[in-house]
């Protein structure tokens, strides 16, 4: 069995936080405009992602995230950077 992708894991976190079916969460969707997330939802999502991936967001990073794909890209870069630092 393969590991879930970063996108899959993030989709599940968002679906749980927003109480939506995971099938309705897509990479190109905007958190606020398309998914209806408010600032409290965003905090909940960020905290869950920080726990899941053992990464931390700074204020500038969270301000730059608009879509699900933006979040995936940020997490993948953080994981790659962490991997490069431990290699």
Curated annotation (Swiss-Prot):
Residues 1-79 form the Carrier domain. GO terms for cellular component: cytoplasm. This is Acyl carrier protein 3. Pathway: Lipid metabolism; fatty acid biosynthesis. 4'-phosphopantetheine is transferred from CoA to a specific serine of apo-ACP by AcpS. This modification is essential for activity because fatty acids are bound in thioester linkage to the sulfhydryl of the prosthetic group. Carrier of the growing fatty acid chain in fatty acid biosynthesis. Its main location: cytoplasm. The keyword Cytoplasm applies. The keyword DNA repair does not apply. The modification O-(pantetheine 4'-phosphoryl)serine is found at residue 39. Keywords: Cytoplasm, Fatty acid biosynthesis, Fatty acid metabolism, Lipid biosynthesis, Lipid metabolism, Phosphopantetheine, Phosphoprotein, Plasmid. It comes from the Bacteria.
């Amino acid at each position: 069995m393969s590991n879930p992708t970063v996108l899959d894991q993030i989709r599940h976190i968002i679906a749980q936080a927003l109480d939506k079916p995971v099938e309705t969460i897509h990479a190109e969707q905007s958190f606020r405009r398309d998914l209806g997330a408010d600032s409290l939802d965003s905090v909940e999502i960020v905290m869950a992602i920080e726990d899941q991936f053992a990464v931390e967001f700074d204020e500038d990073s969270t301000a730059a995230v608009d879509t699900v794909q933006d979040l995936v890209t940020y997490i993948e870069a953080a994981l790659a950077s962490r991997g490069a630092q431990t290699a």
